[in-house]
Amino acid sequence: MQKDLHPKAVPCKIIYQGQVVMETMSTRPEIHVDVWSGVHPFWTGEERFLDTEGRVDKFNKRFGDSYRRGSKK
């Protein structure tokens, strides 16, 4: 078997918006992330509501009853 085939694991800092949010082991000394669990709405419990009623109205306005009846061939 070959020696030193695998890269060495070193302490790694996970960086979010210029701040170290976590330390772990990796082959890279730093990893910059755009989103992490500390700010993601799913993990923080923050709810965001989409304007689904507006989407339905837009769909009905565009297609009307023709979608429900099916296409006539």
Curated annotation (Swiss-Prot):
Belongs to the bacterial ribosomal protein bL31 family. Type A subfamily. It comes from the Bacteria. Gene3D superfamilies: Ribosomal protein L31. It holds the Pfam family Ribosomal_L31. GO terms for cellular component: ribonucleoprotein complex; ribosome. This is Large ribosomal subunit protein bL31. Part of the 50S ribosomal subunit. Contacts protein L9. Keywords: Ribonucleoprotein, Ribosomal protein, RNA-binding, rRNA-binding, tRNA-binding. It comes from Deinococcus radiodurans (strain ATCC 13939 / DSM 20539 / JCM 16871 / CCUG 27074 / LMG 4051 / NBRC 15346 / NCIMB 9279 / VKM B-1422 / R1). Binds the 23S rRNA and interacts with the tRNA in the E site. One of its GO terms (molecular function) is tRNA binding. PROSITE patterns: RIBOSOMAL_L31. InterPro entries: Ribosomal_bL28/bL31-like_sf, Ribosomal_bL31, Ribosomal_bL31_A, Ribosomal_bL31_sf. One of its GO terms (biological process) is translation.
